[in-house]
Amino acid sequence: MSKEKFERTKPHVNVGTIGHVDHGKTTLTAAITKIMSKAHGGEFKDYSDIDNAPEERERGITISTAHVEYESEARHYAHVDCPGHADYVKNMITGAAQMDGAIIVIAATDGPMAQTREHILLSKQVGVPYIIVYMNKADMVDDEELVELVELEIRELLDEYDFPGDDTPVIFGSALKALEDDTSDIGVPSIIKLVEALDTYIPTPKRDTDKLFLMPIEDVFSISGRGTVVTGRIEAGIVNVGDELEIVGIKDTQTTTCTGVEMFRKLLDSGEAGDNVGVLLRGTKREEVERGQVLAKPGSIKPHSKFEAEVYILSKDEGGRHTPFFNNYRPQFYFRTTDVTGACQLPDGVEMVMPGDNVKMQVELLSPIAMEDGLRFAIREGGRTVGAGVVSKVAD
């Protein structure tokens, strides 16, 4: 009997819970898995399963994250929940858990708090495109007016960070009651409503193969009689033999043509996202291309040397620096396949950055790199990772 192939018929979407400590993120995550597993199969994860999240290392940074999955009528969801505030900061900056949308959990008893604000700002900086609000602990508030005030406050807060406050779904309920199988409006029905909001408010993300072609160049060879071959893993899109392409980054942008795609020593007509390939380029000399550049669809990506970034600096325990750094700090920035030196400008009023901090900074690289908002990078000193960051805005 051959093994049954895993059939994924439903589109896949990545989400997560964010919000202030003790507002009920983990209880909500448990409630969703319980109610959805009853309706559509899957596994119920209780609070302690999720709360004792294993530590993972992403780019040398220790992050505790719980991964759960569940299905709705229309989709398959992968959902991340982090036990501690620091884990969220690291997770969002490194992109260890890239979210197509986030559920921000706010206790109706408290309203938005410091970390609520910080998580919304981080979501904006790292490019989380959609936020849905679950107003939790509804069983502990009797005052209708208070609830309306909290809702108004959260909508204004979303507006402040350029999320559409007026259009954002706000679901009112009690994750604890739902977990206890309470069937009143604030119990199980509030979870069903929340998942319906996920289904309708967060668009199905584009698959990598539907995006514009991009391949970071890892190596360059010259094959006598055939020309120059660049190798790498295709990050997005599809490349076909005959396509015109651009080589972007480090030097001036050049145009070239793909005359062959090779994988596992076989010649193909095309290569797609996820494939490790060699791409044969016509009219491009070996010395004109180098590791760190990208091969891309013409006009799809530009080289930049100045950008604004959100950065997490590793703590000493994570193997990072032992001392703070100051304005004009000049480490290497590792983008995709290569290191480029850059200078850091700290925000006004920030004198220094300590290991374990997260900070917004302006960076100017010595040579330009193909980049767009949302690109992740590592910060290194002599090959050792000391930080992680994400481009929040290209500048030049």
Curated annotation (Swiss-Prot):
State the UniProt keywords alphabetically: Cytoplasm, Elongation factor, GTP-binding, Hydrolase, Magnesium, Metal-binding, Nucleotide-binding, Protein biosynthesis
Enzyme class at the top of the EC tree = hydrolase
Q: What is its EC number?
A: 3.6.5.3
**Which residues are involved in binding GTP?**
19-26, 81-85, 136-139
What subcellular locations does the record give?
Cytoplasm
Pfam families to which the protein is assigned, alphabetical: GTP_EFTU (PF00009), GTP_EFTU_D2 (PF03144), GTP_EFTU_D3 (PF03143)
tr-type G domain sequence ranges: 10-206
Keyword Transferase on this protein?
no
Stretches the record annotates as G2:
60-64
Q: Which SUPFAM superfamilies match?
A: EF-Tu/eEF-1alpha/eIF2-gamma C-terminal domain, P-loop containing nucleoside triphosphate hydrolases, Translation proteins
Q: Where is this region: G4?
A: 136-139
Q: From which domain of life does this come? A: Bacteria
Reactions the enzyme catalyzes? GTP + H2O = GDP + phosphate + H(+)
Kindly list the positions annotated as binding Mg(2+).
Answer: T26
Q: Where is this region: G5?
A: 174-176
GO MF entries: GTP binding; GTPase activity; guanosine tetraphosphate binding; translation elongation factor activity
Instruction: Give positions of region: G1.
Output: 19-26
Against PROSITE patterns, the record matches this protein to: G_TR_1, G_TR_2
Per the UniProt entry, the disulfide pairs are: none
Subunit structure as annotated in this protein's UniProt entry: Monomer.
Concerning its family, UniProt says: Belongs to the TRAFAC class translation factor GTPase superfamily. Classic translation factor GTPase family. EF-Tu/EF-1A subfamily.
Record function comment: GTP hydrolase that promotes the GTP-dependent binding of aminoacyl-tRNA to the A-site of ribosomes during protein biosynthesis.
Q: What is this protein called?
A: Elongation factor Tu 2
Gene label: tuf2
